[in-house]
């Protein structure tokens, strides 16, 4: 059991792909890719799942400020990448140093 949000997202994506490979793909190399994407997993881990607990999981007005601050400097290379690609790299390659701060209801509960 793991409470790490990033790890939970990667586990969900991997499980979804595994399920697709063994049930829907059925050996067809051209089968429609019907598995959880990074964008889907991010939504479910934030706003989608947060809706169960009230106004959390989003940076919209009137929502609680719950946030994880990530630093991808250790993963940087000389390629300019859009934020979605940078987040995907963090998701799959993060280390403990990637998380630099955590906020719960606006209060910093962890800072590296």
For each of these PLM feature ranges, what is it?
Residues 64-112:
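C-terminal cap of metal-dependent C-N hydrolases
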């Amino acid at each position: 059991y793991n409470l790490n949000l990033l790890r939970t997202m990667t586990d969900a994506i991997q499980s979804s792909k595994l399920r697709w490979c063994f049930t829907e793909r059925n050996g067809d190399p051209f089968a429609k890719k019907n598995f959880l994407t990074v964008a889907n997993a991010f939504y479910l881990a934030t706003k989608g799942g947060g809706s169960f607990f009230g106004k959390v999981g989003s940076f919209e007005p009137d929502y609680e400020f719950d946030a994880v601050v990530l630093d991808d400097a250790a993963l940087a290379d000389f390629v300019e990448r859009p934020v979605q690609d940078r987040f995907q790299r963090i998701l799959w390659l993060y280390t403990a140093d990637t998380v630099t701060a955590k906020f719960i209801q606006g209060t910093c509960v962890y800072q590296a």
